Amino acid sequence: MFDSVAAELHRDGHHVEAVTLSGLESDGPVDVDRPPNLDTHIDQVTEIIDRGDGTPVALCGHSYGGMVIAGVADRLSDRLDQLVFIDAYVPDDGDSCWSLTSDSFRELFIAGARADGRWVVVPEGLDPRARPHPLPSFVQSIRIGGTLSRALGRTFISGGAWPGSPFVTLTERLRNDSAWRVHEIPVGHNIARRDPHSLAAVLGALLPDSA
């Protein structure tokens, strides 16, 4: 989904790694009987950054991915200079995707996992590359033990007030928080697919001191 965004950023001289979270591989999960949870995904991204060369990272997460990058930042805030939530959940300690989302999405999760209780099937109309999502990652609460550095840039990129968005109230709250920068690309939730050029432009313009 982020291939076009990554390609534009590469052309502008940025190093980009688009991570496919465990269980969402294009050819299916490694072990369908053991769906990964939120901790699995936080561990995965943490390990990728640990293997890097130490250059400060701008860490981006879309939708559920906001849960993941918040968990990584709690562990590796000294390795990051930016957190970018792309129409994404922004958790506090003890929150989960389940607790932060709307009733309609909770119903969607349960209905989608009815077949096996493990994987949430892809709703009709989504990107054809989308894969069933592991239910445990939606319901596990995040554990955030520290306080993020005020020097860490925090950006929220809103897709606008699309029908059913669980992010409208969050967006307005962050607009009034001086620790955050808020951008709007009003094309709906799937910003990377619908307007990759605008998303790449916002990401490419982020500065290390933009807290």
Residue ranges and their predicted role:
Residues 60-65, 69:
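Gly/Ala-rich beta-loop-alpha elbow adjacent to hydrolase catalytic centers
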Residues 160-186, 190-193, 198, 205-206:
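Conserved loop-alpha-helix segment in the C-terminal half of the alpha/beta-hydrolase fold
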Residues 1-21:
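Short, surface-exposed "cap/lid" segments of acyl-processing enzymes
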Residues 15, 21-57, 74, 102:
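Active-site loop/oxyanion-hole signature of alpha/beta-hydrolase fold enzymes
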Residues 74-114, 137, 165-172:
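Flexible "cap/lid" loop of the alpha/beta hydrolase fold
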Residues 20, 58, 81-84:
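Residue in the alpha/beta-hydrolase core beta-strand immediately N-terminal to the catalytic nucleophile
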Residues 128-146:
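Active-site nucleophile elbow and catalytic-triad environment of alpha/beta-hydrolase enzymes
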Residues 150, 156-158:
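Short beta-strand/loop motif that positions the catalytic acidic residue
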